[in-house]
């Protein structure tokens, strides 16, 4: 079947900040040519490594972020290497890059130069702070961007005096920037193909992408001069809310978002459930139901609800609490470790979220996370594991640029590829 982006050719010159964007395009069918230095993409040297054996071809970070891509090694800082990229750009739809501002321009590979030889090319630049402004050349990591954007200030604990903000793991800042970079790139592509037939430069700031996800923090300050504060395991806010984490009988935690429930119907269902074991107690008093009906929050009543629900959840295993709550439309969930999702049939069997990808060099298949979307007519799939370093160099330079064997030998001997 046809893939959604299978007619697109994308050149990628990235580091760890931009490689996820290339993966998203490749997994939807685009031909993504990863242009690596002869020493390899920086992520290839980042662990953990398969089998705990550090190697240029065993980084799990690189594996995940480079599925379906092709790899060519080119030293773009040489005149010949830069010329090779320009030749590839003549027939490319997109150049995706996450190098520092002005770096590609200094090599003759920026948008202003490439658009002269290919007016239809879209160049998407993913940088920490964008191409303009006083921060444009500032160094940043995922942690720096999460801190600068305000995200970290909303994450942490309210029950540990003086505790600092914390940052979630997993390069979430880079992932957010890359997701929005792909959306903006496809928007530019749509404009090109439906209106102007002209490409454009897309300037993506990870800092701005993250700042736009702080939800009500900015409006609260702008309109009310209120600063949201951190709350353990739940949403930050300007008003303290009850704890949402409750221990079950088997020691696992339930995240009970709907406590107290927001509707009378859900309240009635919760009380009926608790009454099955005689644990609703004074919650049967109509004054609690009236509070829910009026959408008010009387502190003493809320505290009583939380206390009794906590005892109720502690009387049963987490799986029972989770599934029974969902049956009556309460937004409760088990707080899982990431690996526990691998055992959930909803994801493994029904959704097929974890594909197995074959690696011929090890003659083994490995389980990967899939995509959070499915296409009924243009399927998403991982057809190839991440490329070995330079695995496709000879094929691409021969088939796309008509280099012969003698040319390729000379390029390799001179260190260009």
Would you name each region that the model predicts?
Residues 327-380:
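A glycine-rich dinucleotide-binding beta-alpha-beta segment and adjacent secondary-structure elements
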Residues 61-63, 241-247, 364:
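Short, surface-exposed beta-strand/loop micro-motifs that present aromatic residues
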């Amino acid at each position: 079947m046809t893939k959604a982006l299978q007619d697109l050719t994308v050149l990628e010159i990235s580091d760890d900040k931009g490689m996820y964007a290339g993966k998203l395009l490749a997994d939807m069918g685009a031909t993504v040519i990863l242009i690596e230095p002869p020493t390899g993409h920086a992520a290839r040297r980042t662990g953990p490594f398969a089998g705990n054996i550090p190697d240029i071809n065993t980084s799990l970070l690189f594996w995940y972020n480079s599925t379906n891509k092709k790899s060519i090694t080119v030293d773009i800082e040489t005149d010949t290497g830069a010329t090779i990229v320009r030749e590839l750009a003549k027939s490319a739809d997109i150049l995706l890059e996450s190098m520092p501002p002005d770096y590609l321009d200094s090599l003759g590979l920026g948008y202003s130069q490439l658009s002269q030889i290919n007016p239809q090319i879209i160049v998407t630049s993913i940088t920490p702070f964008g191409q303009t402004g006083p921060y444009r050349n500032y160094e940043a990591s995922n942690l720096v961007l999460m801190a600068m954007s305000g995200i970290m200030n909303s994450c942490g604990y309210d029950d540990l005096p003086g505790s600092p903000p914390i940052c979630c793991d997993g390069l979430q800042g880079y992932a957010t920037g890359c997701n929005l970079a792909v959306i903006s790139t496809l928007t530019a592509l749509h404009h090109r193909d439906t209106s102007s037939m002209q490409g454009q430069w897309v300037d993506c700031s990870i800092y701005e992408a993250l700042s736009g996800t702080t939800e009500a923090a900015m409006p609260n300050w702008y309109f009310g001069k209120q600063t949201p504060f951190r709350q353990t395991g739940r949403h930050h806010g300007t008003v303290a809310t009850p704890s949402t984490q409750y221990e079950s009988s088997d020691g696992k935690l339930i995240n009970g978002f709907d406590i107290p429930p927001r509707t009378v119907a859900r309240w009635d269902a919760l009380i009926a459930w608790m009454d099955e074991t005689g644990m609703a107690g004074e919650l049967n008093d109509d004054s609690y139901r009236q509070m829910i009906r009026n959408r008010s929050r009387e502190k003493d009543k809320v505290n009583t609800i939380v206390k009794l629900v906590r005892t109720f959840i502690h009387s049963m295993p987490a799986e029972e609490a989770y599934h029974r709550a969902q049956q009556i439309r309460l937004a409760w969930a088990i707080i899982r470790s990431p690996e526990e999702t691998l055992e959930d049939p909803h994801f493994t069997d029904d959704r097929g979220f974890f594909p197995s990808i074959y690696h011929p060099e090890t003659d083994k298949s490995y389980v990967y996370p899939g995509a959070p979307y499915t296409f009924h007519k243009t399927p998403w799939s991982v057809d190839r594991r991440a490329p070995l370093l330079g695995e496709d160099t000879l094929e691409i330079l021969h088939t796309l640029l008509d280099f012969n064997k003698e040319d390729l030998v000379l390029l390799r001997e001179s260190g260009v590829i």
